[in-house]
UniProtKB/Swiss-Prot annotation:
Residues that, per the record, bind substrate: H22, R48, E338
Similarity remark: Belongs to the mandelate racemase/muconate lactonizing enzyme family. RhamD subfamily.
Protein name: L-rhamnonate dehydratase
UniProt xrefs under Gene3D superfamilies: Enolase-like C-terminal domain (3.20.20.120), Enolase-like, N-terminal domain (3.30.390.10)
Record GO terms (molecular function): L-rhamnonate dehydratase activity; magnesium ion binding
Amino acid sequence: MSMPTIRAVRALTVRGGGADYHDQDAGHWIDDHIATPMSRYPEYRQSRQSFGINVLGTLVIEVEASDGTVGFAVTTGGEIGAFIVERHLARFIEGQRVTDIEKMWDQMFHATLYYGRKGVVLNAISGVDLALWDLLAKVRREPVHQLLGGKVRDELEFYATGARPDLAKEMGFIGGKLPLHHGPAEGEAGLRRNLDALADMRSRVGADFWLMLDCWMSLDVPYATRLAHEAHALGLKWIEECLPPDDYWGYAKLRRDVPRGMLVTTGEHEATRWGFRMLLEMECCDIIQPDVGWCGGLTELIRISALADARGVLVIPHGSSVYSYHFVATRHNSPFAEFLMMAPQADRVVPMFDPLLLDEPVPVGGRMKVPDTPGFGVRLNPDVRMQRPYEH
């Protein structure tokens, strides 16, 4: 069987949900008073959208093969990402065999080094890479997890990220991760409110249910260390992404100074094997949390995971729905997965990228069997309006 080549690449954009999960209507828990790097400014504390967290929107990448098969993927990137894909990256994709994923990744990455390396450029590369994996798996009529070597577990189990871990427990999740609401600029009163909220949630879920805090790059080392010590008495399992992503030295110190038994996690906003090599070699964390739609795609996540596995560090990918599920199902050092509660009040399970994807699986009772449908097993919803802002 001769492998088809790629004849077209298209970059589309979507507003309102999808992969840019911050792009939500008013009243959604994810846009509440949540600590961010911008919380130092009072005018940007009450709503994360106030400082533009949702300006990018969703980027949809389609790659079409010469036999008519279409692979696609979604990530965050919007019009900026679409420009990068259409005007720069497409030249490295069109005309290539669908099997040449490694070559295409290498060319995309090295061609963008002078303005890329991380951020929206890596989002764009990640989206193209995921679309290529979807395409190859569809051409071969196999699920992506089969291309990765096959599943090592029959089903995944999940913790839930959202405002209501108490409800997540009732739904069967193994743990709940709360957003931290107040940062250092809100002083002692803010710290006490953070701890009171954690204590209240602990009283609701009992002693054995995992509780974690998502700090979203909003803290400094002294505040994070104090928070960790005071939260330890409340049974906090881990403290996540406390510091700016580039503060490897701060993470290393924090990990040394937190209470014995508490885990330090990070990596959601890190990218490439080199970024994660820094986290691992400097012993910055106990768990890395790459986002497959931001870190370099599945091709790069495979490398990142191997680095972590060699050091005995767990890989629990950030969100990303099916793009993470297929990977987690194939790796022993990814024993569970994250599920983002995207219902506005975090009170029910809805597909993470709703309404953009059809057939997107969701956990039932906190568990899920990864589908065996070819590719990533999802379809684009034809009722969702998409734009193609650039062509090449």
